[in-house]
UniProtKB/Swiss-Prot annotation:
SUPFAM superfamilies membership: Cell division protein MinE topological specificity domain
Role summary: Prevents the cell division inhibition by proteins MinC and MinD at internal division sites while permitting inhibition at polar sites. This ensures cell division at the proper site by restricting the formation of a division septum at the midpoint of the long axis of the cell.
Keywords recorded for this protein, A-Z: Cell cycle, Cell division
Record-given protein name: Cell division topological specificity factor
UniProt entry tagged with the keyword Cell division: yes
Top-level taxon: Bacteria
Gene3D superfamilies: Cell division topological specificity factor MinE
Length: 87
């Protein structure tokens, strides 16, 4: 997979960049006062709302993350959705 990753521009992260990313995530969680339990509850609620409108194909693959931006913190939800056929 390393060759394919290099061909398609995917970069492997070294341990220091992974550690830095994890530390930033912890800092953002602390800054917005969300516990891991609160994040999981928010994730469940987001899924429930989205499922009212579209099919969520793989709930286990959903990722909800908080990131620190220059001007504001950001909540990102990566949710795989089913495709419907055009009629």
């Amino acid at each position: 997979m390393g060759l394919l990753d290099n061909l398609f521009g995917r970069k492997q992260q070294n341990s220091s960049s992974v550690a830095k990313e994890r530390l930033l995530t912890v800092l953002v969680h602390d800054r917005v006062h969300l516990t891991p339990h609160d994040m999981e509850e928010m994730k469940r609620e987001i899924i429930a709302v989205i499922e009212r409108y579209v099919e969520v194909t793989n709930p286990e693959a959903i990722e909800v993350t908080l990131t620190r931006g220059e001007a504001a913190d950001h909540l990102k939800a990566d949710i795989p959705l089913g495709r419907s056929r055009q009629q």
